[in-house]
Amino acid sequence: MKICLIDETGAGDGALSVLAARWGLEQDDDNPMALALTTEHLELRKRDEPKLGGIFVDFVGGAMAHRRKFGGGRGEAVAKAVGIKGDYLPDVVDATAGLGRDAFVLASVGCRVRMLERNPVVAALLDDGLARGYADAEIGGWLQERLQLIHASSLTALTDITPRPQVVYLDPMFPHKQKSALVKKEMRVFQSLVGPDLDADGLLAPARQLATKRVVVKRPDYAPPLADVATPNAVVTKGHRFDIYAGTPA
């Protein structure tokens, strides 16, 4: 995959070249999207809209730390949707990991989560965030046990993941309505890189075959059900719903 690669570390240790080789990234100086290695982290930038800033994965500080410490925990909609109850903490495959937010919430509550991400740039961002998270004194211990990254396409990986999870979680990119053009800055940068998941409908059937208990699909409230398969079961929040489908018992 071609992207503009920028090294701002000043270390001169070739770390960016190693990273590019690992994730199959090619230097493209004219690409509007850039992956920059700073002294703090790896971040994604939209070069033609610099005011949007850089996107990076941070499990240790910022919004994620606030959500972990002061968020709803088990009361969060995603936790309710996957079926967390009492001692039941399902094993989850997050088949559309994105920036790892929902996966992190589930891991922080106690679930073991395997994240799938097919886009190499997004996978590199997740891997960078995980490395910093694993090294953190406060959360590193449980994070290493509960949150892992698999760089693969969900369309193929969902058929051969072992052991089978109890829950498969899907949050495919959905084209935003025109009127929400001022979508969060971060989402604009992210969508410029990955675009909508046009093949997302193909995920529902293999996800239901893989999950032993249920499949949870996060949708904007205005979006039709995934693959046009309606379900009466959903956890509804302001702006979103979590559609729930039966899996295939082991």
Swiss-Prot record:
Q: Which cysteines are joined by disulfide bonds?
A: none
Domain of life the protein comes from: Bacteria
- Please state what the protein is called: Ribosomal RNA small subunit methyltransferase J
**Location of the protein in the cell:** Cytoplasm
The record lists the lineage as: Bacteria, Pseudomonadati, Pseudomonadota, Gammaproteobacteria, Enterobacterales
Pfam families named among the record's database cross-references:
SAM_MT
Q: Which annotated residues bind S-adenosyl-L-methionine?
A: R101, D102, E117, R118, S153, S154, D171
Which N-terminal residues, if any, form the signal peptide? none
Keywords assigned by UniProt, alphabetized: Cytoplasm, Methyltransferase, rRNA processing, S-adenosyl-L-methionine, Transferase
Q: Which InterPro entries match?
A: 16SrRNA_methylTrfase_J (IPR007536), SAM-dependent_MTases_sf (IPR029063)
Which reaction(s) are listed as its catalytic activity?
A: guanosine(1516) in 16S rRNA + S-adenosyl-L-methionine = N(2)-methylguanosine(1516) in 16S rRNA + S-adenosyl-L-homocysteine + H(+)
